[in-house]
Amino acid sequence: WDLWLGPAPKRPYHPDYQPFKWRGWLDFGTGALGDMGCHTVNMPFMALELRDPIAIEAEVHGLTKEAYPKQSVIRYSFPERNGLRPLVMYWYDGGLKPSPDILDGRELPGSGVAILGEKGRMFSPDDYCSTYELLPKEDFANFQKPAPSLPRSPGHAEEWLRACKGGEAAMS
């Protein structure tokens, strides 16, 4: 236990920290956004060339001195980027969700990404954006998926090892 605590202040073991819940404690983790955000928002960050937001606003519920909020909605404002219009991105967690209207009234899953555009919406129903659908479906019935334009990852561990050996930097 002492080894696991590392630089965190010493405290007795409690089952609220292990095996998974450590992520939500300020001394140990980064909350839902830090834990899963790097996976969930990777697709919009890469596709829309998002970098540094110019404003961030947060609405939080259940905030304590020791843990991340139980729920939050975070609004990120991004400026124009390489000819792309400014945009706003929202992060929801703790069971909070946007309006089901973004999926034409269907129930929203517990995780996912939705990109709302002028001509339609792109929705990925999981943490890793491994699949997606274009909505409304009838508007994209003849859509042809483009050929992959980014290099495929051999996996986090392999990328890390290659980078350590002086190879290309990891995609992450």
What label would you give each PLM region?
Residues W1-T30, G34-S172:
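Contiguous beta-strand/loop segments that form the cofactor/metal-binding neighborhood of enzyme cores
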